[in-house]
Swiss-Prot record:
AMP binds at residues 32, 37, 58-60, 85-88, 92, 133, 145. The lineage of its organism: Bacteria, Bacillati, Cyanobacteriota, Cyanophyceae, Synechococcales. Pathway: Purine metabolism; AMP biosynthesis via salvage pathway; AMP from ADP: step 1/1. Catalyzes the reversible transfer of the terminal phosphate group between ATP and AMP. Plays an important role in cellular energy homeostasis and in adenine nucleotide metabolism. It is found in: Cytoplasm. Belongs to the adenylate kinase family. NCBIfam families: adk, PRK00279.1-3, PRK14527.1, PRK14528.1, PRK14531.1, PRK14532.1. One of its GO terms (biological process) is AMP salvage. Its main location: cytoplasm. This is Adenylate kinase. Pfam families: ADK.
Length: 193
C-alpha cells in the first residue's frame, strides 16, 4: 500500500487528490487540519494543547502536530497512508523523517502538485464563493498564504528532491487528468517495486 506525502500551494488540489487516492487504494488519508479539529472536539490532551494556540490565532507547535501524526501512523502501517497538509516546514519534514525511523516506516513518494500563482488565486476565489470559506474569499489573504507557502513549504521541494523521492505533477489541468496521471505514476512504481 502506498505511503505518500502531498505538497503544493494552497488550492493546488492536494486534499481532493489525496482523498481520491485514499478511496482507490483503501488507504487512510491523514490531514493535519482534520486531525486538529477532531482532537480539539474530542478534548484529548493533544487537542486541548492545540486549542490554546488555535484560540489565540497562533500556529500549533510542531511537537503537538507530530504527536497527532504519530498516533495516526501507528494505527495504519500495513494499510499505508497519505499525508495531506503535513509537513509544511523543513523542521516538520525532519521531525517526520525521525518519527518514521522510530516507527520502522518509510514513505514511497512525495507528490508535488505544481500550479501557477494566478491559477491558485482564481481557484481559491472561486472556492471561497462556492463554499463560503472566508480564507479563500479575499485575494489579499490568498496572496499572503502563497507568500507563507513560498517561504515555509517550498523549501521542502529541494529537501525531498535531494532524497530522490519527489515527483512533480502538473496540477494545472482538470482534476480527472491529474488523477489519471497520479494513478499511472503509482501503478508504474508498483510494477517496478
Amino acid at each position: 500500500m502506498p505511503r505518500l506525502i502531498f505538497l503544493g500551494p494552497p488550492g493546488a488540489g492536494k486534499g481532493t487528490q489525496a482523498e481520491r487516492l485514499a478511496a482507490i487504494y483503501h488507504t487512510p488519508k491523514i490531514s493535519t487540519g482534520d486531525l486538529l479539529r477532531a482532537e480539539v472536539k474530542a478534548q484529548t490532551p493533544l487537542g486541548c494543547q492545540a486549542k490554546v494556540y488555535m484560540d489565540a490565532g497562533e500556529l500549533v507547535p510542531d511537537e503537538v502536530l507530530i504527536g497527532m501524526v504519530k498516533g495516526q501512523l501507528q494505527h495504519s502501517p500495513a494499510q499505508g497512508w497519505i499525508l495531506d497538509g503535513f509537513p509544511r516546514t523543513l523542521a516538520q519534514a525532519e521531525a517526520l523523517e525521525e518519527l518514521l525511523r522510530e516507527l520502522g516506516q518509510d514513505y514511497d513518494h512525495v507528490l508535488n502538485l505544481e500550479v501557477p500563482d494566478d491559477v491558485v488565486v482564481a481557484r481559491l476565489l472561486a472556492r471561497g464563493k462556492e463554499q463560503g470559506r472566508s480564507d479563500d474569499a479575499d485575494e489579499a489573504v490568498i496572496l499572503k498564504r502563497l507568500q507563507v507557502y513560498r517561504e515555509q513549504t517550498a523549501p521542502l521541494i529541494d529537501f525531498y528532491e535531494a532524497r530522490g523521492r519527489l515527483r512533480r505533477i502538473d496540477g494545472n489541468q482538470p482534476m480527472e487528468s491529474v488523477q489519471e496521471h497520479l494513478r499511472a505514476l503509482l501503478e508504474g512504481f508498483r510494477r517496478t517495486a
